Amino acid sequence: EYMGINTMDLSEKGDPKKAVFLSVSAGSVSPKSVSPPEQISPGICGTHYPLSIAFIVVNEFCERFSYYGMKAVLTLYFVYFLHWDETTSTSVYHAFSSLCYFSPVIGAFIADSWLGKYKTIIYLSIVYVIGHVIKSVGAIPSVGNQIAHVILSMTGLSLIALGTGGIKPCVAAFGGDQFEEKHVQERNRFFSVFYLAINAGSLISTFLTPVLRGGVQCFGGDCYALAFGVPAALMIVALVVFITGNRLYKKTPPQGNILLEVCKCIVFALRNRIRNHSPEISKREHWLDWASEKYSNQLITEVKMATQVLFLFIPLPMFWALFDQQGSRWTLQATKMNADFKGFVLQPDQMQFLNPLLILVFIPVFDFGLYPLVNLCRINFTPIKKMATGMILASLAFAAAAIVELKIEENAMPIPVPKESYIRVLNLADSDVELTIEGYDLFRQPIKPFQDPAEYSRLILNSDQQFIQVKIQHQGLSSTCNHSIDEMSVNSLIIYKRGGNLTTNIVSWKSNGTKVRYLRIQANVPCMKIIYLFIAKSTQSCWVIFS
């Protein structure tokens, strides 16, 4: 119940938008102002569903598309565009998420105590849009230097967090306000459609935005500006749609901050109990009963109910702390894996679309299939047991992810740092080859023909780009080749015959600060085309040669 309106719990998986509203009636808090009754919005096709909710649902779909689309590519943006390491990228990603989860408190305070829900949504949505625009501009390589990109990105993310979190406690409650008190069934169905819009926006955006990032090239690389620009455009659409329905909305004035009243009640009860902690004073049934000298029995009863619910929520922060790693550590893990499904390559940041997809699939499966079957078996599968089962499954999922990560680390390619590079050799000649690189003591043993390369050898460079001299000996003959090596690169030196003599070719892959297990390279040498798949630190490499 929110300000006298019975709303349902809209807790979305990983969504800061869905705040838990304390069941405190409007009568518990003195209203600041009384306004005349609002004009009721016309019904949709003669039903009891107000036309105004259509604008709210469309707004929610576009806003969720905007938020999840931007967030899907955020970690890879930190790693590959800002060139941060994985630890820093993960820390900033979760700091942003934390701010998104905290700012609903600010939004609720503003809406309840000052502006009301409608104006709060409008003003903070404008802040939201500005943040998106700044974030998109910061992803354009030609705009400033590295420091400018970081400043623009952090400023944009701060505004986005304030905007997206600030409107969270308002939108769902504002939708509930549009219904008359007697239309409980219609209001409950509205929240079902509202939740569907949330997951539909999340599903489409987490699948599409990574395609815009990796499938479209701009400024000579992945198009992060487009990946952030499209969500920005959707947020502008969300704001315009919401404002369009202005004349149809039922707007309730701010009626005081309920959360503040609850906190005051709890503090007063604790202080009163401490002051009267004496054997001569009779004990009370519940510690909150010590607030009865100042607060109504109704408010005290409702606060008791709220504290009981909060006690059940104690394990939830641990669950969500793990769950939110889908966008950080799990996405980074996906960059080290082979996601080629018979020609369809799943982008690492696209993995997140599985969450809303499975939500939409499993909700009807569980509600109309599994749970009725459990009831037929006379198993008392209470909500608490469902929560416990979900947490156990989450633990098993992270155990599986840990095992996968250990296997990846065993075979992961090394990450070169500045003034450092790595090299390995593939011999396509018909006999053994002895190879030396001037200034380095590497490759002491002859390299056999078509031998799977050994582990990468490290090259310490004197500058960000250095020429190396490669000397090869084959059947009593020797030749020398010069190659340019960039810092922070992983190189494949290919030896092959050309006109009866041996020569070399280098194929390089520039590191972006993250480990890679699979590296597919293509080298064109005279009379043959080589496609080589390196599986780092493994003897399971393979090559295909087309003559």
Language model feature labels by segment:
Residues 473-481:
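Short acidic/polar inter-strand loop motif in beta-rich domains
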Residues 2-474, 489-516, 522-547:
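Hydrophobic transmembrane alpha-helices of multi-pass solute transporters/permeases
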